[in-house]
């Protein structure tokens, strides 16, 4: 039985990658297209003046984007993790691994994650677990990677669509609180592409969580992936569940939203998307499916070159936004239009204030 469970887990990991790559050929809207930055025609800064440094859970990093959690737990995904680690090392950006549950249950799979630290010994690496993982096992996940931080992914929609997924969730908050108190490294609680509302963030903040990844809709759709894995495809009505990245970011502009650090991910396609997310308060911006898609279609060298170009393009966008650094960018006026504006109005977000901030 254990061997069958292990094989099922490995197959699921490979299917996640294959289906995720297929999805990234044509991504769903992330609502970021409804956000417009108001720039300047007389910039105060030169490109060389721009400072892209930021912090993730208290760690200073030179660039405001990172490789988000996606994979690990099979022979095939070991190779992908190795290439992602090489990208992270060469581009000097943080990296999170995919859920380590497979390796915690089957020690023969530990190397599919550990390869990341071997290739990138000095980089910032985030371990990744579910709230289902007991504390001692979670500490093993951190040790496995000599991780600098711990991602705890919350994914009820994915679990419910997954035939072999979890069906009990009421203990998650207590488990998360325990990790926040006892983890030897900082904790980030992240969604997996269904987005966090400000109410969810407030609930997490109430138990001591100090950093979240809003992880909205628009990138890899795990409801669709799990539904595609089912023979009956019985949950096709749930494929649009959740809130988009833009909606999650706008929701955090509400006057009653908790004042904690947040990251953004989900459907990030280019440097302009990164700048929009940073302008709406994110400290850094994560990408997973798009990077793996680039790896598959363009190869390792081209993917590294693309991300290096993004750094220069980010500096150009900061100049156009008249912002020397991320702190200044967070005061840049923004126009919210289209469906996102309608959504924000119903959620009582002061869009006029956003449009006229200084």
Curated annotation (Swiss-Prot):
One Pfam assignment: FMN_dh
Residues noted as binding FMN in the record, renumbered to the chain: 69-71, 99, 128, 190, 220, 267-269, 288-289
EC number, UniProt record: 5.3.3.2
Matches recorded under InterPro entries: Aldolase_TIM (IPR013785), FMN-dep_DH (IPR000262), IPdP_isomerase (IPR011179)
Compartments in which it is found: Cytoplasm
Swiss-Prot/TrEMBL cofactor(s): FMN; NADPH; Mg(2+)
Alphabetized GO MF terms: FMN binding; isopentenyl-diphosphate delta-isomerase activity; magnesium ion binding; NADPH binding; oxidoreductase activity
Chain segments annotated as coiled-coil in the UniProt record: none
First and last residue of the signal peptide: none
Any single biological process term in GO: isoprenoid biosynthetic process
Cellular component terms (Gene Ontology): cytoplasm
Residues involved in Mg(2+) binding: 159
Subunit structure: Homooctamer. Dimer of tetramers.
Task of the protein: Involved in the biosynthesis of isoprenoids. Catalyzes the 1,3-allylic rearrangement of the homoallylic substrate isopentenyl (IPP) to its allylic isomer, dimethylallyl diphosphate (DMAPP).
Family: Belongs to the IPP isomerase type 2 family.
Name this protein carries in UniProt: Isopentenyl-diphosphate delta-isomerase
């Amino acid at each position: 039985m254990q061997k069958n469970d292990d094989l099922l887990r490995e197959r699921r990991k490979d299917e996640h990658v294959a289906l995720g790559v297929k999805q990234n050929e044509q991504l769903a809207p992330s609502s970021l297209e409804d956000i417009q930055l108001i720039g300047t025609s007389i910039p105060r800064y030169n490109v060389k003046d721009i400072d892209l440094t930021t912090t993730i859970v208290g760690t200073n990093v030179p660039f405001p984007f990172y490789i988000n959690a996606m994979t690990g737990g099979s022979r095939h995904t070991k190779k992908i993790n190795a290439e992602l680690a090489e990208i992270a090392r060469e581009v000097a950006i943080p990296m999170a691994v995919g859920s380590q549950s497979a390796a915690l249950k089957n020690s023969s799979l530990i190397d599919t994650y550990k390869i990341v630290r071997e290739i990138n010994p000095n980089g910032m690496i985030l371990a990744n677990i579910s709230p289902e993982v007991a504390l001692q096992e979670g500490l093993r996940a951190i040790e496995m990677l000599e991780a600098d931080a711990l991602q705890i992914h919350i994914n009820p929609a994915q679990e419910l669509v997954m035939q072999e997924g979890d069906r009990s969730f009421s203990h998650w908050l207590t488990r998360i609180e325990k990790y926040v108190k006892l983890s030897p490294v900082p904790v980030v609680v992240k969604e997996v592409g269904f987005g966090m509302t400000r109410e969810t963030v407030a609930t997490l903040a109430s138990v001591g969580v100090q950093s979240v990844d809003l992880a909205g809709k628009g990138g890899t759709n795990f409801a669709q992936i799990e539904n595609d894995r089912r023979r009956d495809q019985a949950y096709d009505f749930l494929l649009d569940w959740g809130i988009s990245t833009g909606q999650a970011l706008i929701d955090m502009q509400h006057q009653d939203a908790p004042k904690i650090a947040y990251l953004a991910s989900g459907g990030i396609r280019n440097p302009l998307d990164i700048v929009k997310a940073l302008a709406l308060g994110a400290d850094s911006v994560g990408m997973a499916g798009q990077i793996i898609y680039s790896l598959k279609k363009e190869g390792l060298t081209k993917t590294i070159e693309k991300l290096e170009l993004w750094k220069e393009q980010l500096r150009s966008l900061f100049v156009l936004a008249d912002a020397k650094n991320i702190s200044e960018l967070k005061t840049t006026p923004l126009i919210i239009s289209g469906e996102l504006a309608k959504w924000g109005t119903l959620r009582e977000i002061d869009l006029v204030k956003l449009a006229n901030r200084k």
